[in-house]
UniProtKB/Swiss-Prot annotation:
SUPFAM superfamilies: ClpS-like (SSF54736), Ribosomal protein L7/12, oligomerisation (N-terminal) domain (SSF48300). One of its GO terms (biological process) is translation. PANTHER family: 39S RIBOSOMAL PROTEIN L12, LARGE RIBOSOMAL SUBUNIT PROTEIN BL12M. It comes from Leptospira interrogans serogroup Icterohaemorrhagiae serovar Lai (strain 56601). The gene is rplL. One of its GO terms (molecular function) is mRNA binding. GO terms for cellular component: cytosolic large ribosomal subunit. NCBIfam families: L12. The keyword rRNA-binding does not apply. Belongs to the bacterial ribosomal protein bL12 family. InterPro entries: Ribosomal_bL12 (IPR000206), Ribosomal_bL12_C (IPR013823), Ribosomal_bL12_C/ClpS-like (IPR014719), Ribosomal_bL12_oligo (IPR008932), Ribosomal_bL12_oligo_N_sf (IPR036235). The lineage of its organism: Bacteria, Pseudomonadati, Spirochaetota, Spirochaetia, Leptospirales. Forms part of the ribosomal stalk which helps the ribosome interact with GTP-bound translation factors. Is thus essential for accurate translation. Keywords: Ribonucleoprotein, Ribosomal protein. It holds the Pfam family Ribosomal_L12_N. This is Large ribosomal subunit protein bL12.
C-alpha cells in the first residue's frame, strides 16, 4: 500500500477511530502524539504577568457523566459536534475526550453549563 493510499484511508476515519489509532500507535511504538514543549532559557517573567494574560481559547473536555442521563449527554454531543449516533456514543463512553476545541471563554462556559445540566462532568482546558 502506498503512503498516499494509506493517507486516504486515514482521512476517512471518524474522530473516535482516529483517536483509537493514535493510542494504538503510541502503545506499539512507545511514542507520544503530544507536541514537545520548548523550554526557553529566558529570565523569569515579571511577577503577576501570567495571571494578567488569561487564555482566550479553551477545549471543552467531557470527563464523565451520570449513567442515568447517558442518552441526554449523547444527544447533546451530537447537537454540539454534528457527529453521528455511533461516534457520539463512542466519544461519551470513552471519557476524557474533547467535545469542542479552540472555543472562546464565553462559548466554553455556555457549553459547560449545558453539559452539566444534562448530567455530564466537564473540564475547560486552555488551548
Amino acid at each position: 500500500m502506498s503512503t498516499e493510499a494509506l493517507l486516504e484511508q486515514i482521512g476517512k476515519l471518524t474522530l473516535v477511530e482516529a483517536a483509537d489509532l493514535v493510542k494504538k500507535m503510541e502503545d506499539k511504538f512507545g511514542i507520544s502524539a503530544a507536541a514537545p514543549v520548548a523550554v526557553a532559557a529566558v529570565g523569569a517573567a515579571p511577577a503577576g504577568a501570567g495571571a494578567a494574560e488569561e487564555a482566550s481559547t479553551f477545549n471543552v473536555i467531557l470527563k464523565g457523566f451520570d449513567s442515568a442521563k447517558k442518552i441526554e449527554v449523547i444527544k447533546l454531543v451530537r447537537e454540539i459536534t454534528g457527529l453521528g449516533l455511533a461516534d457520539a456514543k463512542g466519544l461519551v463512553e470513552a471519557g476524557g475526550k474533547a467535545v469542542k476545541e479552540g472555543v472562546a471563554k464565553a462559548e466554553a462556559d455556555d457549553l459547560k453549563k449545558k453539559f452539566e445540566g444534562a448530567g455530564a462532568q466537564i473540564e475547560l482546558k486552555a488551548s
